[in-house]
UniProtKB/Swiss-Prot annotation:
<keyword id="KW-0456">Lyase</keyword>
<feature type="binding site">
    <location>
        <position position="288"/>
    </location>
    <ligand>
        <name>Mg(2+)</name>
    </ligand>
</feature>
<dbReference type="GO" id="GO:0009986">
    <property type="term" value="C:cell surface"/>
</dbReference>
<feature type="binding site">
    <location>
        <position position="166"/>
    </location>
    <ligand>
        <name>(2R)-2-phosphoglycerate</name>
    </ligand>
</feature>
<keyword id="KW-0460">Magnesium</keyword>
<dbReference type="Pfam" id="PF03952">
    <property type="entry name" value="Enolase_N"/>
</dbReference>
<keyword id="KW-0964">Secreted</keyword>
<dbReference type="GO" id="GO:0000015">
    <property type="term" value="C:phosphopyruvate hydratase complex"/>
</dbReference>
<dbReference type="InterPro" id="IPR020811">
    <property type="entry name" value="Enolase_N"/>
</dbReference>
<comment type="function">
    <text>Catalyzes the reversible conversion of 2-phosphoglycerate (2-PG) into phosphoenolpyruvate (PEP). It is essential for the degradation of carbohydrates via glycolysis.</text>
</comment>
<feature type="active site" description="Proton acceptor">
    <location>
        <position position="340"/>
    </location>
</feature>
<protein>
    <recommendedName>
        <fullName>Enolase</fullName>
        <ecNumber>4.2.1.11</ecNumber>
    </recommendedName>
</protein>
<keyword id="KW-0324">Glycolysis</keyword>
<dbReference type="InterPro" id="IPR020809">
    <property type="entry name" value="Enolase_CS"/>
</dbReference>
<feature type="active site" description="Proton donor">
    <location>
        <position position="208"/>
    </location>
</feature>
<feature type="binding site">
    <location>
        <position position="340"/>
    </location>
    <ligand>
        <name>(2R)-2-phosphoglycerate</name>
    </ligand>
</feature>
<dbReference type="GO" id="GO:0005576">
    <property type="term" value="C:extracellular region"/>
</dbReference>
Length: 431
């Protein structure tokens, strides 16, 4: 096998994401003519501690959201350093970009510029070696197909309705395989559409393909999903479980949680009790960002109350950052990390966060962003690291479906070697 393949060109362009906002796409060409292409996603509800997504700020173009500065950084500063380097040395590539940037949060070059290059290099390397991306990143033991965490009702910043919690999801942990899990989710999605229509609700969809009905309360969203699970012929709490992403940083004001849609303002202790009640009443297996990103005390309360039986995922809390994750592990808060490549900005830093989480007994859930592209890197990544869980939207909208379809291809390629762990993917809780 080759051990040195030279990078001969690094080129970026501005393209559009699924929310009609500009984003960065990067092509990396190698000495043998092989090319790797990667497009970068973008979030709507972003954590305050995420790496910087460089935007142009020129209001006369794309409402200030252009990424031509980031593109230029790739085509000049980054390309000048990386051309001539060995594409197989991912650690050196990412380290070089981190040093070129020189800031704690990628503010100079932009995490969107750096991530595009980092992923395009990995893809070019895999292509040159004739390997699948998941095999290249994960090696010979990359084999676990993930349980989908599928967003089917949107609220909060992902939808224009009065539901406070941002995402209501289903997880087919009782399925025997990934393809069967996907089928189950698809059937529940269709059943939910029919259920909402029959009750007079709108069936327009949000950024991630989930429905965005103007429901009366957060709890009603859970109830209507449970109806849909049953309508599709499955058993809630056995075949399919519920997962929530309240995105609590978005509703945290002056030390309290404002559930405006329900006309309630709760203290951290009361908010924790709110989740306890929901988890006792419904088959909730996972709650993401149940508390705000800087409410460490609230997180501690929530973890002590239900951290042994519900997966508590830190997204805004950890932002795929080993420093923040390390603090959380020491404090004993949460038991899982959401992995978003663009929160940190390079592939190797992402892999470091996953490794740290797993060493501490935390699960890692690989995730999309609300602004996505047709890029399917996260489908390969989740299998590469055997994470066992993926969050990439509803089984609708082609930028979401692209990831599921890639996982179907990987499942087919792995054949008998592939594993779908179902409930065993939740090694962080008592089931």
């Amino acid at each position: 096998m080759k051990n040195y393949i030279e990078i001969v060109d690094v080129y970026a362009r501005q393209i559009l994401d699924s929310r009609c906002n500009p984003t960065v796409e990067v092509e990396v060409e190698l000495e043998d003519g092989t090319v790797g292409v990667a497009a970068v996603p973008s979030g709507a509800s972003t954590g305050a501690f995420e790496a910087v997504e460089l935007r142009d700020g020129d209001k006369s173009k794309y409402l200030g959201k252009g990424v031509l500065k980031a593109v230029d950084n790739v085509n000049t500063i980054i390309a000048d350093e990386l051309v001539g380097m060995n594409v197989l040395d991912q650690v050196a590539i990412d380290k070089t970009m981190i040093e070129l940037d020189g800031t704690d949060n990628k503010a100079k070059l932009g995490a969107n510029a750096m991530l595009g290059v980092s992923l395009a290099c990995a893809k070019a390397a895999a292509n040159s070696l004739g390997m699948s991306l998941y095999q290249y990143i994960g090696g010979v033991n990359a084999k676990v197909l993930p349980v989908p965490m599928m967003n089917i009702i949107n609220g909060g910043k992902h939808a224009d309705n009065n539901v406070d919690l941002q995402e209501f999801m289903i997880m087919p942990a009782g399925a025997p395989s990934f393809s069967e899990a996907l089928r189950m989710c698809s059937e529940v999605y269709h059943a939910l559409k029919s259920t909402l229509k029959s009750q007079g609700y709108d069936t327009g969809v949000g950024d991630e393909g989930g429905f965005a009905p103007n429901l009366k309360s957060n709890e009603e969203a859970i109830v209507v999903i449970i109806e849909a699970i049953k309508e599709a012929g499955y058993t809630p709490g056995k075949d399919i479980f519920i997962a929530l992403d309240p995105a609590s940083s978005e509703i945290f004001e002056d030390g309290k949680y404002n559930l405006a849609g329900e006309g309630r303002v709760l203290t951290p202790e009361e908010m924790a009790n709110y989740y306890v009640e929901l988890a006792e009443k419904y088959p909730i297996i996972s709650i993401e960002d149940g508390m705000a990103e800087e409410d460490w005390d609230g997180w501690k309360i929530l973890t002590e109350k239900i951290g042994n039986k519900v997966q508590l995922v830190g997204d805004d809390l950890f932002v795929t950052n080993t420093e923040r994750l390390s603090k959380g592990i020491k404090l004993g808060v949460a038991n899982s990390i959401l992995i978003k490549l663009n929160q940190i900005g390079t592939l190797t830093e992402t892999l470091n966060a996953i490794e740290m989480a797993e060493r501490a007994g935390y699960t890692a859930v690989v995730s999309h962003r609300s602004g996505e592209t047709e890029d399917t890197t996260i489908a390969d990544l989740v299998v590469a690291v055997n994470a066992g869980q993926i969050k990439t939207g509803a089984p609708a909208r082609s930028e979401r479906v692209a990831k599921y379809n890639q996982l179907l291809r990987i499942e087919e390629e792995l054949n008998d070697m592939g594993e779908y762990r179902g409930l065993k993917a939740f090694y962080n809780i008592n089931k």
